[in-house]
Amino acid sequence: MASMVSFCFLLLFLAFFASSFNEIYAEESESKEFVLTLDKSNFFDTVSKHNFIVVEFYAPWCGHCKKLAPEYEKAASILSSHDPPVILAKVDANEEANKELASEFEVRGFPTIKILRNGGKIVQEYKGPRDADGIVDYLKKQSGPPSAEIKSIEDATNLVSEKKIVVVGIFPKFSGEEFENFSALAEKLRSDYEFGHTLDAKLLPRGESSVSGPVVRLFKPFDELFVDFQDFDVNALEKLVEESSVPTVTIFDKDPSNHPFVVKFFNNANAKAMLFLNFTSEVVESFRSIYREVAEKNKGEGISFLIGDTESSQGAFQYFGLRDDQVPLIVIQNNDGTKYLKPNLEPDHIASWVKEYKDCKLSPYRKSEPIPEHNNEPVKVVVADSLDEIVFKSGKNVLLEFYAPWCGHCKQLAPILDEVAVSFENDPDVLIAKLDATANDYPTNTFDVKGYPTLYFKSASGELLQYDGGRTKEDFIEFIEKNREKSSKKESIVKDDQTDSETKAEL
């Protein structure tokens, strides 16, 4: 569930961060199609024949997929002339027959692009651009050697950019256990980082030039600018690279060069502290300075730190249910989705508030829409602040839908649930309800919501079942009748009445 929370959170941030795509022309091309069309029947047979193949999982209704399509086709055309040719393919993951395939490759949204190596034995995420030229450049690098040899200062200058992370191995010779382990690391992490190797540290722009190796040097555009490692265990190297490639404080603003670090921030396993303020305000430098001190003091303590400009952070405000009049503010989110909020923050509050968080002295913050003043529709509206009362403490049999306002399947389901609710309108033991999961927090350890709509049934006695049956009116009614129980509140009232009667009789 933690991965779903992080995944959804990340999407909301990136929706406000990503730069717009180039405008797409709508003319139909009569030229040859270079993108292979795969499905369940030919997927594995095709993939097994290629040492390197790229597969897009798409849905016909997906707007981003439609924007990508001509760029992807153009890239496939160009890469067909590469030596050796780079094959691009696509799978309609909306087709019923291909849904199992999409599930196997952990497709959680569209479009999802995977790089498959060694006949499909190695699967990696595509993490490159989505315009034709960007796709071509990225895949040329990905299809080549995982690490580039640095033979000159020019080679080093071309590889080690001021705005990206690069991992370079320095060796006395390109053989032996250390070099093999470095090569294995480069192969494993090539989708995330660029790698190089050299026999001469003097060619490199930063760091001790007299080192003969073996040493791994990570170059980065923040903090201490480079770090040297000498532990050549692959797992240890990977951990060191991952930890060193996250800034002490990640910057979230409109600068596209910060984008990869924002992604890494949300993908790491730490709790996430996020300070939001107006970057044009007079107090911004005071906040930055103190926040960085706190981040450095808590390094290695399981908390990652980000500072975001309110102008660029509307996705976060939507996700957390925050308001501009609460700025400056700080939020900490655990991987289980629990959140803690300190609005109207002063710089000297930061250190003490983070300490209170670490000492478990803070009360969780819960995002909730207002409880409706009138809730008279057949399907009852549930918000975070009324979830306990309406669902868990009502003593009723409750069918609860978790939905998103933008979800097409949810819109299709809405009139059906209305009909189901009307069918039980005069039944005091049954309630049909809905909760906007994008606007309200809910206990993620109780409800496993991986997509929309997700439905749960809570019986009168409190037993919880996830509904995975059909979606007709008859399907829902049959399920409710099969799993319903007598109202626990009604039984309690009867017992209380009986006790009162017995007491009166004794008197």
Curated annotation (Swiss-Prot):
Keyword terms: Disulfide bond, Endoplasmic reticulum, Glycoprotein, Isomerase, Redox-active center, Repeat, Signal
Residues covered by region (Disordered): 484-507
Coiled-coil region(s): none
Site (Lowers pKa of C-terminal Cys of second active site): 471
Full protein name: Protein disulfide-isomerase
Glycoprotein found in the keyword field: yes
Catalytic activity: Catalyzes the rearrangement of -S-S- bonds in proteins
Gene3D superfamilies assigned to the protein according to its UniProt record, in alphabetical order: Glutaredoxin
All copies of domain Thioredoxin, residue ranges: 21-144, 365-485
Function text: Participates in the folding of proteins containing disulfide bonds, may be involved in glycosylation, prolyl hydroxylation and triglyceride transfer.
Classification via Pfam families: Thioredoxin, Thioredoxin_6
Protein localization: Endoplasmic reticulum lumen
Protein family: Belongs to the protein disulfide isomerase family.
